[in-house]
């Protein structure tokens, strides 16, 4: 029984699915997808639970969310292992994901009050008050790269605001989704407030097609995000949050400290085996001897990265990709770029056929035409050389995406110029592209998403503002508008 609907664990009536470890092929989870009728049942349960949940005092909702945080802390080792085994990422990195989930609770409580709390201004004859109200029933679509942390970034703010939810994890990480929901169950959520439906494309389409849905919070690929945007067009009554991918540029203008610049680049491009939406995909390196030395050192150090199993000792920097198919897609993207005229600096290599273990690849594409503007979700870094900083900014902005951008330089003026001209929601200076603060907004422009549906601004998508002019009693104004006569006439 792998679906949780209206407080009950039930068996899916859809396609049979099993999840294996992407490196060892060990079977980790088996279950059936939710069919369309079960998705509708989950929505009905959420709708029925909404009025009572929304009317709960905020403190009551907060108490349940904080109980969930305590359960995360108590079961940190267990959840870390589930995430690591299911995604293929090393244990150390999975542990940081669970820590981020725990930290998200206090941050979301602060964000609720800062972004969507109540404000009151006294007027001469009353008060003007701003309040926020939950949307109602929201769907949450989770990704596979951070199957605990990223859905958590929508679920927690949405529950705090008083919404009820239907959560569909990625079909590639059902085990993590189920494990997290069991902790929510133990935290004491009332029946129907949070519902779990497992499944792939058909389940997702059934969920996004529901008429009785007040909104959808999505994290995933641009192609799926665009599909959802088209599907919900003409329905302004539904809130849609899209957190999508990026084709992110990292500009190496001044690499005087070569090893520090190489370390920053490795952290930007290859952490999580390149499976972060903020990962550097395009490396822009200034022409000249310093840039040559930087690239040579980058290829040298990156070539020593050996992906390993989640529980290897010592731990590897990167583990496997989410699937062998994902690793194959990266290999095909590299070969495509070679066929276009790219010059391979470091060839990616499958460590073992049939697994998702893949070494990093680096390919130079300076002067190559018709390079696809796409997010290759894995450890493949594309290099361009440039002559001057204005050209670097032009290259950086030459994409339909706009998530993250970074600069390695000692010149503050160059960073200020980049801040003004970059088309990106995150612009870092001498910091990895993959570094982001949960106390700041997270998201991008263009094909990277709409507004900032994650991190500090996630609360904005979970409640709508209600403005009120109010007074405890009704009185006649001392001064009337022109043309109004309230004088009492003598009876004749």
Swiss-Prot record:
CDD domains: ALDH_SGSD_AstD. The active site is at residues 243, 277. It catalyses: N-succinyl-L-glutamate 5-semialdehyde + NAD(+) + H2O = N-succinyl-L-glutamate + NADH + 2 H(+). Its EC number is 1.2.1.71. Keywords: Arginine metabolism, NAD, Oxidoreductase. The keyword Nucleotide-binding does not apply. GO terms for biological process: arginine catabolic process to glutamate; arginine catabolic process to succinate. One of its GO terms (molecular function) is succinylglutamate-semialdehyde dehydrogenase activity. InterPro entries: Ald_DH/histidinol_DH, Ald_DH_C, Ald_DH_CS_CYS, Ald_DH_CS_GLU, Ald_DH_N, Aldehyde_DH_dom, SuccinylGlu_semiald_DH_AstD. The keyword Oxidoreductase applies. NAD(+) binds at residues 220-225. Induction: By nitrogen and carbon starvation, and arginine, via the ArgR and Crp transcriptional regulators. Gene3D superfamilies: Aldehyde Dehydrogenase, Chain A, domain 1, Aldehyde Dehydrogenase, Chain A, domain 2. NCBIfam families: arg_catab_astD (TIGR03240), PRK09457.1 (NF006992). Belongs to the aldehyde dehydrogenase family. AstD subfamily. Catalyzes the NAD-dependent reduction of succinylglutamate semialdehyde into succinylglutamate. This is N-succinylglutamate 5-semialdehyde dehydrogenase. It comes from Salmonella typhimurium (strain LT2 / SGSC1412 / ATCC 700720).
